[in-house]
């Protein structure tokens, strides 16, 4: 049987759970850095430029490669003969560099072998837990999310009127958005120029900026000491390491199902996303997941990293929750998969495809909205393939009209109008992002010749 598990509130969990997260000193360069300088257990965070030569998976059967093909090619130092799948490197002959964090290098070294790894540049800063005011703020919205989920479940169980369920679902969505926006505030570009509109041509351009000056303004560095400014009260570095720690957490769950250097890697893991994993379960795997969840729960109780919801339940961060079971699973590429969910009534098709609407309004039936859902359009798992076209739930396209603000007469009505965006439905076809084997010719790409 297949199972699907999700990390509970992945990014907020990483914000609340990790001590080495909040940058409290300026990044300093390490002289003659080693891998040990780059990856350490002290209260520091590190990033820099790392050199790699001739990499390959430790186990060819491991189904979750880590290194991005695009980032590898962007840092190419020679011709590179590589094999990639779904935008991730399986094997590469050649030399390249990556700009990565300490967490990334730790994961890469667990998954890949390389002929050579060197640290070209290592920048390190002291780090500390989030300030209490932000931790409390995250807890507040975590509780709100948990409470609204309970309210929605109670309404659904009681077969409440559709309007009540709809309103409760909207409330939950708003709370989730605010909860996740806390991480988003740490992920704003610290060096973004103002957008300037030319009143004559109506063209919009971004102002040119001096990056080093903008970084100094953002972090408020004065007289060689770290002094946060009002503009930099939520450091960008927190967003960087939050996502890095979240990647490490999901890979720790992947390694339970598929050890990167063991013989059990083949066939057990099916698909991984930012915070979810689809896999083939067995008794030993489920026991390991529950042991890990128990460890996270005990640590949360000890450290106070939990909330109590409106039903008196203790809800902790970092749990890897079981979502559903499935009988068949089909993966095409990132954010594009389908499976037959196991239910008491039998198999139920579930489809996930980026950019595809969950449903489309066909009209009214018996006084109620009549929708067609994306699963109805796909019909069966066998029909879900590369080049399948969603004709009903496809997507939308936008057309923009530039016009001076004016008042016009439309059928006797005086209507004020101006710039407009016309949104119309459109079809969407699934693309093929399969296995690729290519030779990247460094000299041709460097000079712009093909």
Predicted stretch roles:
Residues 1-450:
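Conserved acidic
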